[in-house]
Design a protein with these regions (language model features):
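N-terminal regions that are enriched for targeting/export leaders
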Residues: 1-71, 76-77, 447-459
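Hydrophobic alpha-helical transmembrane segments
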Residues: 75-83, 337-348, 414-415
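Transmembrane alpha-helix boundary signature
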Residues: 46-51, 118-130
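Central hydrophobic cores of alpha-helical transmembrane segments
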Residues: 361-371
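Membrane-proximal extracellular juxtamembrane segment immediately upstream
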Residues: 374-389
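Membrane helical hairpin/interfacial module
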Residues: 62-126
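Long, contiguous internal "core" modules enriched in hydrophobic/ aromatic residues
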Residues: 18-47, 93, 140-338, 348, ...
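Extramembrane terminal tails and long inter-domain/linker segments of multi-pass membrane proteins
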Residues: 1-27, 129-145, 174-209, 282-283, ...
């Protein structure tokens, strides 16, 4: 599957450092536009905090809407980094090399964005401290530490800390490379961040062992984070469609599906914007598409299991909710779009190699997947709260306000803005990984055919 490309070190340095040493012409206008969107979003968030949640479409009984849906979505996107970097690093998959750093970055910035939504959803963000530490002793009131709302920030904070450390350890050799190629304040910055890296055998060994250990340590956190997020819903028996024991694995595999698809989207953009055709190649998209076929099919199985579990109990409210999701307007339209975009359109297309190696088709199908996965979270959260029951006299339909949609758009602008800022100071494709790949790969003769192979020393 891997095609042999011989690239010398000078060419690799020149191409992969062009974002840091020579700014592309499109970079500044794009960052300015994104910066304006980010400032507009921050202004809207400030107005909402000042005015209260009354400016949103949230009302009884739908108190969880667009904000919590987007929170779950970004936590799911963050699973891309560990899926691509940690698991594929442990399995020594060669095709991971161009995509590891972008996936790790997506993890860190997605988690930073996800943390914003519970804060603003609280209405009074300054009182979040009461979730983390005891109330004043005079009142004798303490937070319920068994609540998922307490476990969420703990799990996400741990995941964010580990992911940041994981990213930084892998960045050290490239920081030293930049230190040796820059002058002035940039040289001082890279000198501090490189931590005295000289590339001697002892440092390389420690960096390699550190990456493997962090990969292994991050795997249980990777599983636990979205499991805990799923328990925000699974431990609420009063809402139909939420109280399900299958939610933890269902959410985790759905997160991997959306996260890896987001990495495909980002890889295509990196290839087009920075002209990295020699580093991000069609075979990398082919490998990720094969991975996505497996993950998406597993996710589809859990989707059917979740539906079967709901219907198996013959509980009238559960059956009424499923009828509402699939047969009542507008939920039925959203359900059809969700199912088409998350599986029925992209996965059959990925079965053909000419689609898997077509970067444009992979780009658009990966976007379709994340449209579908966002709708999946929306259909899990909102219909269960919005379903009208005969004994609830204070209900209203949920209509997301312009404030909610603006903050939703802000989240995408914010993540993209952070990615472009990072690309200005640090390489998005790890240089040392590319150079190591050139050392490890070679052409070998098998019979009369010459094929690419990975050569490693035996222990």
């Amino acid at each position: 599957m891997q095609q042999r490309r011989s690239l010398d070190q000078a060419y690799t340095n020149r191409k992969l450092l062009n974002g840091q040493l020579d700014t592309p012409k499109w970079w500044a206008p794009t960052v300015i536009v994104l910066g304006i969107l980010v400032l507009i979003g921050i202004g809207v968030i400030s107005v909402m905090i000042n005015k209260g949640l009354g400016v949103t479409g949230l009302s009884r009984p739908v108190f969880w809407g667009l904000f919590i849906t987007t929170f779950v979505f970004w936590v799911g996107i963050s699973h891309a980094g560990i899926m691509i970097s940690a698991i594929l690093r442990l399995t020594q998959a060669e095709w991971r090399r161009p995509v590891t750093r972008a996936a790790e970055l997506l993890t860190v910035f997605s988690l930073l964005t996800a943390l914003v939504f519970p804060l603003i959803h609280a209405g009074r963000p300054w009182r979040i401290a009461y979730w983390i530490m005891p109330y004043d002793f005079g009142r004798g009131i303490y937070p319920n530490i068994r609540s998922p709302l307490i476990m969420d920030p703990v799990a996400i904070g741990t995941y964010l800390t580990g992911s940041t450390l994981f990213l930084y350890v892998a960045l050290l050799p490239d920081l030293a490379n930049l230190r040796d190629r820059t002058k002035g304040w940039r040289n001082s910055l890279y000198t501090v961040l490189a931590l005295g890296w000289r590339g001697n055998p002892r440092q390389w060994k420690m960096q390699t062992v550190g990456g493997i250990l962090l990969s292994a340590l991050m795997l249980p956190i990777f599983v636990s984070v979205h499991s805990i997020v799923s328990w925000d819903f699974a431990v609420v028996p009063a809402v139909e469609g939420w109280h399900s024991t299958i939610f933890a694995p269902y959410f985790v595999i759905g997160a991997v599906h959306s996260g890896v698809s987001a990495v495909v989207t980002m890889m295509a953009l990196m290839r087009w914007l920075w002209k990295w055709d020699d580093f991000i190649r069609p075979e990398h998209f082919d490998a990720l598409a094969r991975l996505l076929i497996v993950v998406a099919t597993g996710w589809l199985g859990f989707t059917f299991l979740e539906l079967i579990f709901a219907l198996y109990g013959q509980d009238a409210p559960e059956i009424a909710l499923r009828e509402m999701q699939m047969f009542i307007w507008p939920w039925n339209m959203l359900f059809i779009i969700f199912f088409l975009t998350a599986y029925l359109i992209p996965v059959p297309m990925w079965l053909f190699k000419r689609v898997r190696t077509n970067i444009a088709l992979m780009f658009w199908t990966s976007i379709l997947v994340n449209i579908g996965m966002w709708l999946e979270r929306f259909l899990i959260i909102v219909p269960g709260l919005a379903r009208r029951t005969p004994f609830v006299y204070t209900w209203d339909s949920y209509r997301p306000s312009a404030v909610e949609w603006t903050i939703f758009i802000w989240s995408f602008a914010w993540v993209t803005f952070l990615m472009l800022l990072f690309s200005k100071f640090f390489p998005l494709v790890p240089l040392f990984e590319q150079k190591e790949s050139q050392v490890f790969t070679d052409d070998v003769m098998i019979g009369r055919a010459k094929v690419p192979a990975v050569l490693r020393e035996a222990d």
